């Protein structure tokens, strides 16, 4: 299956897995927001440290604005394959199209590692 139009770079499965883990840790020891509305507000206000966007969102227009907004606000973002798994990592029983980490808590080093890897991926994708 091809990637939706809003996916600007390929994220390796192991990096997506780290993003899920970081969200779970931040949920327990820091602060997160879940859902596209809350995530959008946090990005607009410059509060988000890392944004997670699911690749299997239907219709894709729900999250299509997030990569552009993150670029504009210089906030790192990463794609994850499953909205269901994203919801679980965020601690809710339903799927989440997107989520963001505001305070990474004990996931600080993991978030920094993810941001570094994402920046390298974006650089490669731009070439």
UniProtKB/Swiss-Prot annotation:
Q: Give the location in the cell.
A: Cytoplasm
Xref: SUPFAM superfamilies: L30e-like
Q: Name one GO molecular function term.
A: structural constituent of ribosome
State where it is primarily located. cytoplasm
Q: Name one GO cellular component term.
A: cytoplasm
Any GO BP annotation? tRNA 5'-leader removal
**Classification via InterPro entries:** eL8/uL1-like (IPR050257), Ribosomal_eL30-like_sf (IPR029064), Ribosomal_eL8-like_CS (IPR004037), Ribosomal_eL8/eL30/eS12/Gad45 (IPR004038), Ribosomal_eL8/Nhp2 (IPR018492), Ribosomal_eL8_arc (IPR022481)
Subunit details: Part of the 50S ribosomal subunit. Probably part of the RNase P complex.
NCBIfam families documented for this protein: eL8_ribo
Q: Hey, which family's this protein in?
A: Belongs to the eukaryotic ribosomal protein eL8 family.
Q: What is this protein called?
A: Large ribosomal subunit protein eL8
- Organism, as annotated: Hyperthermus butylicus (strain DSM 5456 / JCM 9403 / PLM1-5)
Q: What is the lineage of its organism?
A: Archaea, Thermoproteota, Thermoprotei, Desulfurococcales, Pyrodictiaceae
Q: Which gene encodes it?
A: rpl7ae
């Amino acid at each position: 299956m091809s990637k939706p139009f809003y996916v600007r770079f390929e994220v390796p499965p192991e990096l997506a897995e780290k993003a899920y883990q970081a969200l779970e840790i931040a949920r327990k020891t820091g602060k997160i927001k879940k859902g596209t509305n809350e995530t959008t507000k946090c990005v607009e206000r410059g509060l988000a440290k890392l944004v997670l966007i699911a690749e299997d969102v239907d219709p894709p227009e729900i999250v299509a604005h997030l990569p552009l907004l993150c670029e504009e606000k210089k906030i790192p973002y990463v794609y994850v394959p499953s909205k269901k798994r994203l919801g679980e990592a965020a601690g809710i029983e339903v799927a989440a199209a997107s989520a963001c980490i505001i305070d990474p808590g004990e996931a600080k080093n993991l978030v920094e590692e993810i941001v570094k890897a994402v920046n390298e991926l974006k650089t490669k994708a731009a070439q």
